[in-house]
Curated annotation (Swiss-Prot):
Transferase as UniProt keyword: no
The name this protein goes by in its record: Lysophospholipid transporter LplT
Summary of the function given for this chain in its UniProt record: Catalyzes the facilitated diffusion of 2-acyl-glycero-3-phosphoethanolamine (2-acyl-GPE) into the cell.
Residues passing through the membrane, by range: 16-36, 53-73, 91-111, 139-159, 164-184, 227-247, 253-273, 281-301, 305-325, 352-372, 373-393
Amino acid sequence: MSESVHTNPSLYSKGMLAVICAQFLSAFGDNALLFATLALMKQLYYPEWSQPVLQMLFVGAYILFAPFVGQFADSFAKGRVMMVANGLKLLGAGCICFGVNPFIGYTLVGIGAAAYSPAKYGILGELTTGDKLVKANGLMESSTIAAILLGSMAGGILADWHVLAALIVCALVYGGAVVANLWIPRLPAARPGQSWRFKPMTHSFFSACRTLWRNGETRFSLMGTSLFWGAGVTLRFLLVIWVPVALGITSNAMPTYLNAMVAVGIVLGAGAAAKLVTLETVSRCMPAGILIGIAVIAFAVQQSLLPAFGLLLLLGVFGGFFIVPLNALLQERGKHSVGAGNAIAVQNLGENVAMLLMLGLYSLAVSVGVPPVAVGIGFGAVFAVAIAALWVWGRRK
């Protein structure tokens, strides 16, 4: 294994390809494991209300460990941090395979995912820089979306065949991610020697929050990415109740196909952003953010399948074009102020809090009887207005 302390000028260096491969396997395992675990819970007659609790534990791990995972990523070689995090995921999947309570096993996977995220994004800024960082983010997002698509389908298909076999495959995939991490060059720690006592660590994290919030560019990025991912999770749940009402289709598979169209669009949009947007022209992505909300409104009133597929594909393109430059901006600016690991940890906190808040508002709307079509229209309108307000505010600052 080679060791390097310099940024490699090539976008397709061995280290970068190892990062992308490890990310694909890790994200594939996350999504396959979710569906395999849900199938296990169904087989064991867990109540239906327990299924979203599984996802809440996963998201909750990000929020609970946010003050610590950024420093963890910046205190050691990020490739090794990624390996340890994938090892935790492997342990969690193994626990579920051996009959440990699935909530415990999946919580371990969530902790691993929380530790993994700052390192996987932070290392991009150490392996490449400048405009190539935007392209590297495009590769990362594209591999992630591909893993979400394939992992979700694989988890469901394998679980229909044999639940335990599906869980074992998930564990093996995490094992493959650990092996892929071995090929990532051992870069020097970004910020070694920091205190590991609880109070200094939390103080350091919230100090990083203040630093990033006071900077106009990083505040702009944090708010944009939080809105995007909060909306993305909400849309996934909205599709489940919208399909039977708007299209008259009761198949469980149809919402999955529609989600797949969004994912394909994100890959296309991420590729376009890598070619058309630089760190100096990040504001070009903002119209795409507004168009996401408009596309949701147009989608919500559809009653035919083909236009619905087309609009969700377009929505995904806008989403990919919107999110990739904002991620790159935060990594580049955060690397020089609080460290890339801390910057991504702060970003994760914002995004996961946004997910919980938006899902809470969505659940409230559904619980009081708001029709799914009206929920979609209101959701799209609020998102478009929020992004427009963020754009105007950012230009004034």
